[in-house]
């Protein structure tokens, strides 16, 4: 006979442990327990039945796996936390005894990261445990970069020390330097939250958010303790990643840092890159641009490769012979690129190849750009340098490290301004350094654009037309480059006629006709009112200017405002006019022997265009009804599980189609309104 199982010794009660029990088992404080769980990646768990798991009368809210807590018992950081706890007790006892000198001595041994910025422990082993390979670290770099860039822009407070902010900013600038040298930056997008960046490092897409540069106001209801715990781990992680990235392209890490330039707000210019990956003139070779380090090839293998290249070149120099088919017709090879069409009507839109041989990473290589004071200098400098621009200038008040601080430099080809042009005012005392932006003060031969020109150019991998981005011009919509166009969904870059369905096109045409009829009816009413006014003798005949002046003087002298009786008479006249018009329409309908609605329907039926549209609309309705019936019959052949899954898919697809149709309808109204405004 087996032994009777006791309650709480097996099953769910054994697999879970409460937070209080875990803290007591590890013999550390609750804040240290939170830190340890964040760094080791251990999260609370939700059991299926809390009553079976809880061993106390009170309902516990936080549970952990027992195996996870058992795993934490072997963590080396526990010894550091316990030593710190013992030291804090010794300091409190010394102060209780009144021994200030002993308490001061012990305080010197205590680790105060909020004051020194250097904790008594390191998280290197934790990073190695959580990320066994470098690719794993790259895949988890999104949140790391977003948090570090956020803290780099925060002001120093008691909860966020200045040394922590300085280290975050330095790590972020080092990462930006790698992106500039390797040309790994792919896309960027301006949003309300901040600026999104996307880079491709060793085949992994990394997306992070950078807040705008302005004075942050830190409120008191934010818990910086938890965020600071994440920042400690993320700083160690990004340090590892930067070291690996720099060494992979032959650069020394960390790069030389000039504190003097950093005090002058040089940002990227405060760092000097060194290593075998850089040439003597500071240019980057092709190996760095590809993201790999240089290596000396084998001489024998290189000789074979050179021989093979010569043979290929000699084969290309020979004239291609004409190809004849079975009918004797000759076909000459063409350089046309195949166009990839989707296999199914609802398939994804395929990327088409092009003849473009230009490197997107060198998009601004031939440009010398000057940034005005109101433009976001840090973001623009990073993007322009990442896409090949070597000559970037700005006003000296924005910081050090500019190619030129003279706005009137003749070598400048583009100037980025972010304010509308204003009329220049003569000033005898001297003119400001930004007067070239003013009307009549522009430098001849220079292109003036707004900052959005840079973002749209890098997202489309081509320099956009500067006329659309001129100062004061209405900018084109800034679309997100991270959204991929899918068949059937609304695409703002495609004309409306190419993506709308037949039913939507018919509905749009009918709306246009209704608006035209409404406008025509209003015009007819105005004409009828004018005719009635002439018949009643109320039309004014144009006289001389002297008569008009005399009439105006008499009216000004004798007018004392409208009386209530006159207002009532005017309203009665309007009612009589509208009633007369309605009576005339009814008489015409009586003479023809039909009702008013029937006569209007006959007018529409007499129009061949409206008849064809009505016929087409009926055909579309019949076709949609047949497709729905076929779909219902096909669903009857499915199993219950698959039918439910199919209904869920259909519901989500119909919801997306409705949203796309709503956006297309909104665009149709806007385009119609703009066309009407241009016509008037």
Swiss-Prot record:
It is found in: Nucleus, Nucleolus; Nucleus, Nucleoplasm. The gene is NOP7. SUPFAM superfamilies: BRCT domain. Keywords: Coiled coil, Nucleus, Ribosome biogenesis, rRNA processing. Belongs to the pescadillo family. One of its GO terms (cellular component) is nucleoplasm. Component of the NOP7 complex, composed of ERB1, NOP7 and YTM1. The complex is held together by ERB1, which interacts with NOP7 via its N-terminal domain and with YTM1 via a high-affinity interaction between the seven-bladed beta-propeller domains of the 2 proteins. The NOP7 complex associates with the 66S pre-ribosome. SMART domains: BRCT. This is Pescadillo homolog. Residues 315-336, 494-680 are annotated as: Disordered. Residues 597-610, 617-635, 654-664 have a biased composition (Basic and acidic residues). Residues 511-530, 543-556, 565-576 have a biased composition (Acidic residues). Residues 359-471 form the BRCT domain. Component of the NOP7 complex, which is required for maturation of the 25S and 5.8S ribosomal RNAs and formation of the 60S ribosome. CDD domains: BRCT_pescadillo_like (cd17709). InterPro entries: BRCT_dom, BRCT_dom_sf, PES. Residues 665-680 have a biased composition (Basic residues). GO terms for biological process: maturation of 5.8S rRNA from tricistronic rRNA transcript (SSU-rRNA, 5.8S rRNA, LSU-rRNA); maturation of LSU-rRNA from tricistronic rRNA transcript (SSU-rRNA, 5.8S rRNA, LSU-rRNA). GO terms for molecular function: ribonucleoprotein complex binding; RNA binding. Residues 609-680 form a coiled coil. It comes from Pyricularia oryzae (strain 70-15 / ATCC MYA-4617 / FGSC 8958). PANTHER family: PESCADILLO - RELATED, PESCADILLO HOMOLOG.
